[in-house]
A protein has these predicted regions:
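Carboxylate/His-rich catalytic cores and anion/metal-binding grooves
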Residues: 111
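Catalytic core of nucleotidyl cyclases, primarily class III adenylyl/guanylyl cyclases
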Residues: 133
Length: 172
């Protein structure tokens, strides 16, 4: 996500995928209730992607991680239920709610049909829906309170497990 969303990275792509794979593999064996990675589409959306691209890139990143650990011999049901996602709440309420609801069905289909998941929890789209960033303005911090409430409403109607909203004066 750093490479796609920000054009920069700490490690090149392949070593990064290997490192995330190491984390997922370790957690599957030693900390099975821990969420080893939060797949992030948020930064990609903040970089100019539309809602469809945000979800698509997020799912492609998650698939790259899944492919890595499955190639090591893990079964999808050993880790998929603990993956989490970080997506952006921005814009039209109906479009955003539809995006998240469609994303849940699509992720379930990917995990079941492409990876052969058998456990229902492997199909869950566990997500944080965050709002702020590009949607807040420096010039009108009081109006950002309304924007934050609006983003929170979208997250709630979308069924997000977690939400992260910026403070009214956190515009950047």
């Amino acid at each position: 996500k750093e490479f796609i969303g920000r054009g920069t990275w700490f490690y090149p792509v392949q070593p990064s995928i290997k490192l995330v794979g190491d984390t997922i593999e370790y957690c599957a064996e030693h900390a099975p209730k821990y969420s080893p990675v939060s797949v992030c589409g948020y930064h990609i959306r903040e970089s100019g992607a539309n809602p469809v691209q945000e979800m698509a890139y997020g799912f492609c990143i998650a698939k790259a991680y899944a492919d890595e650990v499955i190639a090591r011999g893990l079964d999808v049901d050993e880790f998929a239920g603990r993956l989490s996602f970080n997506f952006n709440v921005f814009g039209n309420i109906f479009e955003q709610v539809a995006k998240f609801r469609a994303g849940r069905g699509l992720w379930a289909k990917i995990v079941k049909e492409q990876y052969g998941a058998r456990k229902p929890e492997s199909e869950w789209l566990r997500m944080l829906a965050g709002g702020g960033g590009g949607g807040l303005t420096f010039e009108q911090p009081e109006v950002n309170i309304v924007r934050g409430a609006y983003y929170g409403l979208i997250a709630a109607l979308s069924g997000a497990q977690t939400t992260a909203l910026c403070c009214f004066d956190e515009a950047y």
